[in-house]
């Protein structure tokens, strides 16, 4: 086991959880919450639990070194020290969590962006289209990305389809599929983050809302209903609002 860890650390200095916490506590002027969050979420570590950074100065040096490596491909590159001073003490630039974890990280494949909005080009109401989105969502979440996508294109419950079922199951089963996929993905103790949305004029919009309110049904996603001006005018004027009959 020692030999394996020695190989995995690639000759880098390592720190215990307590060493990193105490150094970070000093960095954050006694703020225990900030120190714990930084050590647990953003300090460079490998899958064996080895910690390679003792405080954010080490992290900022890692970021500066990697950004400088890319800078050197172009004319008039910024030096590593210049970039470090811009990042140091979170003074001028505070990167998102994804970049703080992912840039220069040779132990983990991580996204360099926190959030993604995804969807298929063209028709995406087929089961194959739904599965494609599910796979794309999982791959992004594996890399610490949060994901959002819209379900307004899915045919409402009872719509005719050309398969053995003859009619569509509607939005709710697909909400559950995406929600379950999100709960199954965990990276460094973090569950995937998912936002699902639907237009208020979709015939299944009420079922969409009810699904989230049903205990244990859609626990892996936040949901959002997109409201249009016509709906708001109907509310203000106490009028009826008609949804689309088809998608």
What kind of feature is each model-predicted range?
Residues 1-245:
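Extended catalytic cores of very large enzyme megasubunits
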């Amino acid at each position: 086991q020692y030999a394996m860890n020695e190989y995995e650390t690639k000759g880098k200095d390592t720190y215990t959880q307590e060493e990193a916490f105490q150094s970070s506590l000093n960095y954050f002027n006694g703020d225990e919450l900030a120190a714990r969050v930084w050590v647990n979420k953003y300090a460079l570590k490998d899958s064996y639990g080895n910690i390679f950074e003792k405080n954010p100065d080490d992290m900022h040096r890692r970021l500066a070194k990697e950004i400088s490596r890319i800078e050197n491909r172009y004319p008039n590159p910024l030096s590593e020290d210049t970039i470090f001073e811009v990042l140091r003490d979170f003074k001028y630039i505070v990167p998102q969590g994804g970049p703080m974890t992912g840039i220069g990280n040779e132990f983990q494949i991580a996204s360099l962006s926190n959030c993604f909005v995804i969807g298929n080009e063209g028709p995406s109401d087929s089961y194959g289209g739904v599965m494609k989105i599910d796979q794309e969502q999982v791959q992004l979440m594996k890399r610490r990305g949060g994901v959002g996508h819209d379900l307004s294109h899915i045919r409402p419950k009872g719509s005719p389809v050309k398969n053995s079922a003859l009619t569509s199951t509607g939005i709710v089963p697909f909400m559950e599929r995406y929600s379950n996929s999100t709960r199954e993905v965990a990276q460094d103790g973090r569950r995937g983050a998912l936002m699902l949305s639907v237009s208020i004029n979709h015939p299944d919009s009420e079922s969409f809302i009810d699904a989230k309110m049903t205990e244990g049904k859609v626990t892996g996603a936040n949901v959002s209903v997109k409201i249009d001006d016509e709906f708001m005018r109907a509310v203000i004027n106490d009028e009826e609002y008609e949804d689309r009959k088809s998608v």
